[in-house]
Amino acid sequence: MIQSQISQNARLALSEVILLAKARKDLSFAQITEGTGLSEAFVTAALLGQHPLPASAAQVVGDKLGLDADGIALLQTIPLRGSIQGGVPTDPTIYRFYEMLQVYGTTLKALVHEKFGDGIISAINFKLDVKKVDDPEGGSRAVITLDGKYLPTKPF
């Protein structure tokens, strides 16, 4: 039976256990994801308490990380989502995304509405991908793809 969380506490505690096991076993999120049939971004979000995993994926992940039956079951619960608490984020990496939306948020909104009409980009019917590519000027660049279904506003 599908279960749901009413607070973030249990999933946050499990995330701490998961991250310790990941470090202890020297695993990457990509390695943990292998065999689940899901994307690295989705599994990572689930491990950080933002999505439930299907039973088969939870078992694969749990086996790799050495989670007990309760941990594997908890990975399958629907979490109370939202990982950034307390307003403006203080972590530098997360803050840069916040900053990008502060600078480009209204631009994104204007372009989405101009190209699609009044509506939103779904974060439910959604795909996320992060790639590291070489920068022709030296170093590396991050290519982050946000791929969400457009949902038009419907008058009622």
UniProtKB/Swiss-Prot annotation:
Keywords, A to Z, come to: Lyase
Record's Gene3D superfamilies?
A: Cyanate lyase, C-terminal domain, lambda repressor-like DNA-binding domains
Broad enzyme group: lyase
Gene designation: cynS
Q: Which SUPFAM superfamilies is this protein grouped with?
A: Cyanase C-terminal domain (SSF55234), lambda repressor-like DNA-binding domains (SSF47413)
Q: Which family does it belong to?
A: Belongs to the cyanase family.
| NCBIfam families documented for this protein | cynS, PRK02866.1
Q: What is its EC number?
A: 4.2.1.104
Q: What is this protein called?
A: Cyanate hydratase
Q: Does the keyword Magnesium apply?
A: no
State the organism named in the record.
Answer: Pseudomonas entomophila (strain L48)
Cross-referenced PANTHER family: CYANATE HYDRATASE (PTHR34186:SF2)
Sorted alphabetically, the Gene Ontology BP terms of this entry are: cyanate metabolic process
